């Protein structure tokens, strides 16, 4: 009876253990299993492994889904392709967090999904380090890359880099948590690249993986020709082994047929920097207690040097030997039977990894979290994927970072100019504690300038121009600015108080609104009286009542009389220029220099252009667009009064009508100013506006050679739901006019971009738009393309009058922007935000490069 009870307890314990193992085997809490390219939100359970796969839609922001018609394995039937961007990234956030070890596996099958019959080649990155290069030799080949990785942060970035040798893609991405024992698969650099993993037995049967292997390691059957398989039907335990080997793998072993022969294996190593990490797994599968006088004992050696002597595997228990040989051209492993052994050596399983340097730390965690938060809160539409600062060739657009081999990279500069930011200035900026330059200009930011910006002790440039910020500026920022050690740019924020004195004490807060109310009432009464006097005077100034434009009733702009215009221009004494609309005169209004555009009576299109320009200028306000001061319309006399630009227009400068030749830096700044004005028309106006007459003569310069886009006589609004054509009336200036508008009989924002591309080419070359000879007419774009094709040297197209104090790479960048803008394929033309970013980067390059 006692014997029966004992057996019952044994079987009960064994059954309970089996239940525990089964539950653990089914636990996928440490798994992230992604079938790339399947429909968003979808998932399924694999019939063979029982692994739950999900769509990649919540792990990646870019790419397009593609499918392969004929493939057996379900995880290879779909893929995600990345035709755009130099780097695209998946973000994995395992629940176990950072400082843990994970097995990460990426799989690829080309399957000629794109019909190109190509051999795509691209780079694979993990965090800020190169993982491997993926090369698909044909459509049916399957490539799998695997790494054991010690995570540095909560987020794990797996990225694909475009090498220009085919479109990157990925079929499957898998992550497996390897338990809490970080001594398992230990590596000095935090990463082990998979080389091979063998289940040493006969070649019959399939690879072993989950749920037989709790970590979903894939074990490939392998047998040496001089060996045979031995096995057991009993389970092999790994209770005291942190590698948690599969019982199915460990229940088979390989042993030499010739019992006196050793087991040998050789690794060829052509790279002296490569270090192999070898894991040999042993378990005795024969019950030697049933074989009297039989023993199994052997030595383990590397290149003839014994590293483990007299080793005897334990029956049905896993033992692992970790071997880390010195790097040599040939590494020979041997399992040699000892003299007292009666049985040959055995080995059950083998893993080989390569230890490579993952020496580059990720971007400082606080910095990375800050810009990631900004990306989310402002919905930043930039190619911001993966680690912000790494690898260096893939740094996030608009960022600069500092690099130190001993510490993680830090973000030192952030340019979010013209990025469509709205709302308040985010507190996340306060976490960029090493930031030196911050540009938030040309956005829609509102509210106060927060005090925390003054606490960023390394900040030396802060640009907040052209937003809608209100309130007073923190006194510390103003004080730092006054010392000259800090550049603070606050222009074009009408509601912003920039004087220290405007920060009043609390005792005055109740007085100010009361005084302001009385003052406002007084001003209102005064203006009413002035308005009545002006109206009576205007009614008497001409015999017939003036035809007041309907726009004057709806827009709060000053309507002048023709008599006022005669006075301010000194009876039209100084002509500034002439055009199809009429003549522009110089004048003064309240000691302010103005330009008066008088519409010609003979201009057939004049009144339409006049009305269009007034409609545009009374509703758009931007630092890079000419500002309307007023207008007049009496009888046949009509015109505009706008701010005077002292340095004329860009066309005259390029034509050599001024003594000073503009430098490349000045031209870049002018191009950027004009681009920002055009970007505002396209992206900042509701509804958007197409200019339709972008040219160098419509880019005006002030005394500091800062530019504003002018002449909106041909401008038209267009609606976002039907932007393909704005107007069926083709208008503009030959040479700048998009040739495709005659095919489509319409103009749109891409037509403006074509014109701006021509402007850029003029600025680069100093050439006229069209060069005419007796035999032909050559457009500047055709000339540039011809020269670059024949010489591939951008210096051959640069304006010879310009000083050679420039970075040739920035010129190349602008040439590329210009040529893409004038592309005959409209879809290849960039939009204005892209052009603005490109010009901004070029200007920053010029300003930071002091050693030409």
Swiss-Prot record:
GO cellular component, one term: membrane
UniProt keyword list: ATP-binding, Glycoprotein, Kinase, Leucine-rich repeat, Membrane, Nucleotide-binding, Phosphoprotein, Receptor, Repeat, Serine/threonine-protein kinase, Signal, Transferase, Transmembrane, Transmembrane helix
Gene3D superfamilies per record: Galactose-binding lectin, Phosphorylase Kinase, domain 1, Ribonuclease Inhibitor, Transferase(Phosphotransferase) domain 1
Signal peptide: 1-25
Phosphoserine sites (modified residues): 697, 727
Pfam families: LRR_1, LRR_4, Malectin_like, Pkinase
Active-site residues, Swiss-Prot/TrEMBL: 693 (proton acceptor)
Catalyzed reaction equations: L-seryl-[protein] + ATP = O-phospho-L-seryl-[protein] + ADP + H(+); L-threonyl-[protein] + ATP = O-phospho-L-threonyl-[protein] + ADP + H(+)
UniProt repeat feature LRR, residue ranges: 410-432, 434-457, 458-479
Positions annotated with a glycan in the UniProt record: 138, 182, 231, 240, 258, 293, 400, 415, 431, 466
Positions in the Extracellular compartment: 26-510
Molecular function, one GO term: ATP binding
Domain Protein kinase: 570-843
Stated name of the protein: Probable LRR receptor-like serine/threonine-protein kinase At1g05700
């Amino acid at each position: 009876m006692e014997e029966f009870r004992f057996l019952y307890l044994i079987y009960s314990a064994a059954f309970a253990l089996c239940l525990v193992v089964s539950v653990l085997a089914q636990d996928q809490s440490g798994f992230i299993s992604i079938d790339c390219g399947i429909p968003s939100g979808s998932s399924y359970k694999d019939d063979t492994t029982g692994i739950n796969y999900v769509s990649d839609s919540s792990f990646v922001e870019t790419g397009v889904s593609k499918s392969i018609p004929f493939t057996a394995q379900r995880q290879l039937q779909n893929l995600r392709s990345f035709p755009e961007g130099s780097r695209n990234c998946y973000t994995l956030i395992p629940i176990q967090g950072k400082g843990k070890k994970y097995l990460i596996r990426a799989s690829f099958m080309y399957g000629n999904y794109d019909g190109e019959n190509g051999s795509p080649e691209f780079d694979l990155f993990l965090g800020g380090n190169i993982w491997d290069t993926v090369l698909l030799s044909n459509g049916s080949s399957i490539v799998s890359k695997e790494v054991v990785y010690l995570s540095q942060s909560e987020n794990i970035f797996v990225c694909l880099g475009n090498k220009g040798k085919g479109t990157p893609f990925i079929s499957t991405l898998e992550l497996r948590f390897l338990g809490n024992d970080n001594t398992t698969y230990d590596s000095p650099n935090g990463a082990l690249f998979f080389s091979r993993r063998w289940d040493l037995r006969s070649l019959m049967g399939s690879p072993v993986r989950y749920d037989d292997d709790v970590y979903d390691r894939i074990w490939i059957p392998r047998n040496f020709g001089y060996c045979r398989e031995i096995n057991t039907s009993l389970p092999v335990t790994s209770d005291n082994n942190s590698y948690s080997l599969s019982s199915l793998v460990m229940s088979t072993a390989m042993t030499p047929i010739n019992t006196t022969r050793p087991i040998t294996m050789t690794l060829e190593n052509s790279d002296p920097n490569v270090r192999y990490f070898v894991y040999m797994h042993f378990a005795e599968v024969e019950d030697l207690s049933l074989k009297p006088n039989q023993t199994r004992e052997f030595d383990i050696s590397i290149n003839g040097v014994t590293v483990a002597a007299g080793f005897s595997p334990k029956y049905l228990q896993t033992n692992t030997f970790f071997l880390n040989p010195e790097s040599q051209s040939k590494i020979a492993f041997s399992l040699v039977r000892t003299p007292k052994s009666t049985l040959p050596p055995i080995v059950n399983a083998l893993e080989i990894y390569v230890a490579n340097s993952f020496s580059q730390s990720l971007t400082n965690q606080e910095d990375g979290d800050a810009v990631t938060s900004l990306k989310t809160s402002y919905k930043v539409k930039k190619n911001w994927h993966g680690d912000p600062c790494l690898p260096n060739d893939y740094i996030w657009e608009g960022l600069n970072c500092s690099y130190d081999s001993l510490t993680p990279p830090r973000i030192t500069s952030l340019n979010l100019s013209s990025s469509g930011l709205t709302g308040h200035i985010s507190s996340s900026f306060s976490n960029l504690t090493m930031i030196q330059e911050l540009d938030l200009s040309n956005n829609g930011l509102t509210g106060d300038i927060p005090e925390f910006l003054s606490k960023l002790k390394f900040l030396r440039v802060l640009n907040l121009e052209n937003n809608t910020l209100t309130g007073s500026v923190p006194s510390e920022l103003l004080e730092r600015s006054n010392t000259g050690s800090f550049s603070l740019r606050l222009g074009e924020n009408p509601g912003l108080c920039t004087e220290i004195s405007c920060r009043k004490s609390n005792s005055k807060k109740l007085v100010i609104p009361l005084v302001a109310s009385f003052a406002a009432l007084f001003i209102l009464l005064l203006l009413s009286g002035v308005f009545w006097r002006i109206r009576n005077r205007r009614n008497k100034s001409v015999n017939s009542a003036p035809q007041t434009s309907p726009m004057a009733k709806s827009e709060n702009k000053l309507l002048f009389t023709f008599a006022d215009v005669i006075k301010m221009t000194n009876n039209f004494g100084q002509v500034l220029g002439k055009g199809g609309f009429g003549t522009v005169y110089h004048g003064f209004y309240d000691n302010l220099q103005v330009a008066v555009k008088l519409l010609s009576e003979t201009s057939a299109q004049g009144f339409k252009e006049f009305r269009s320009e007034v409609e545009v200028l009374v509703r758009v306000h931007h630092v890079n667009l000419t500002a309307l001061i007023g207008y007049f319309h009496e009888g046949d006399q009509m015109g505009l009064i706008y701010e005077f630009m002292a340095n004329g227009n860009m066309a005259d400068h390029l034509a050599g009508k001024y003594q000073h030749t503009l430098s490349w830096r000045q031209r870049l700044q002018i191009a950027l100013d004009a681009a920002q004005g055009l970007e505002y028309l396209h992206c900042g106006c509701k509804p958007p506006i197409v200019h339709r007459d972008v040219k160098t003569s419509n880019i005006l310069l002030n005394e500091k050679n800062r530019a504003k886009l002018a002449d909106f006589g041909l401008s038209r609004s267009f609606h976002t739901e039907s932007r393909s054509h704005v107007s069926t009336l083709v208008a503009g200036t030959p040479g700048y006019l998009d040739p495709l508008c005659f095919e489509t009989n319409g103009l749109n924002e891409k037509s403006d971009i074509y014109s701006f591309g021509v402007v850029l080419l003029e600025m680069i070359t100093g050439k006229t738009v069209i060069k005419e000879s007796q035999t032909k007419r050559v457009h500047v774009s055709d000339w540039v393309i011809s020269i670059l094709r024949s010489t591939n040297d951008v210096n051959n197209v640069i304006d010879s009058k310009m000083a050679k104090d420039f970075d040739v790479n920035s010129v190349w960048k602008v040439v590329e922007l210009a040529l893409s803008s004038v592309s005959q394929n409209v879809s290849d033309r960039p939009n204005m935000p892209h052009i603005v970013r490109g010009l901004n980067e070029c200007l920053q390059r010029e300003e930071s490069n002091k050693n030409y």
